[in-house]
Amino acid sequence: VRLPTEFYQRVRADLRQRLDAAEIDGVLVTHPADVAYLMGFFYAVTERPVYLWFGTTPGGDFCVVPHLDVEYAAAQQVDIDLVAYPEFPGVVSAEQHLAEALTVRGLAGARIGYTTGVSVATLDSWQQLLHGSTFEPFTGIAAMRAIKHPEEIYFHEQAAEVCDDMLRAGRALIEDAWRREQTLPTEGEIARHVITFGTEEMYRRFDHVIFTTKLAGGLVYAGPNAARPHGLPSSRRLQAGDTLILSLGAAAASRFVESERTFILGEPSDQQRRYFEVTATAQRVGTDAMRAGRTCAEANQICLDVIRDGGLGEHIRHRQGHGIGLQNHEGPWLDDGDDTVLAPGMFLSCEPGVYVPGHGGYRISDSVLVTEGAPRRLTAYPRSLEENVIA
């Protein structure tokens, strides 16, 4: 699984233009997702740093990597010069190798951009080793990643299919136990089952799997536990009458997708119907609000106002959604505090929720592509109450 060379050429040309516009000589990249985006290098993240230098001069780019990753980078057809350092912390540090590589390329006094997420300690070490250089934040890569290319959308589509199948696998596990009159599974058992299913499906579809964090994952919570939006799966066993949230994700070529559904175990009560329908309406209205030209804050308000108007505002615990890409959570953010204007090619979750302490939670999430026209859901698992009753 590797995006075509043309993709990386296009991305790098865009980045050089942004560097020129910012009047800086280059950018130091440290985040694994940014490294993967610019050079197609996916690696196991440890204490050993990886530093990518990308400059305005073609041919001068390089990546500082631990020696143990050199062959693996070559196997991924990385076409940027590698500067290997022996080990961490090393007699000569990775930062010293970086400074030397910049110096021999005549960049010791360069204007250097750095991406968000760089630690204070790392930035301080760069400044001490490169006295003549100036450093300033650079957000251009985040802006680039927010707009998905067609090659990326293809892998998001593949991940969406797997993610929907993970929901089916989780439901089937519960239904099978119920049909056989066996003990219902625990939250943890369901989580293990769907994650294993999703991971195996990725290996079945692709001959060489690459990822920045994981191939498949998920949160599973039922009954009162479902009132905690990001609670971890527990050993609690499902019971008739429970509300169950399957919050699942998958990634193809490290392009993520999430698909989340709320299920009712047995005949829904009037209370469950009300909570579910308000959530489903907010999700439908919120998805339609994700149109090019509207701000993230405006879409968020339109979505969550459905819950407030339904008399359930006190049970809101989070924003409408977030960007998805090489990370499961990335900008832009569908939140009151983000005035980013939605644009075609942006890919975000729409996941409003209602959480009632002591009772349960309700959340429906799709991964949505912003287009020139109507928003496009890539995830397609059924959303209605009738289709999500397990009986």
Language-model region placement:
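Active-site neighborhoods and metal-handling regions in enzymes and metal-associated proteins
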Residues: V1-A391
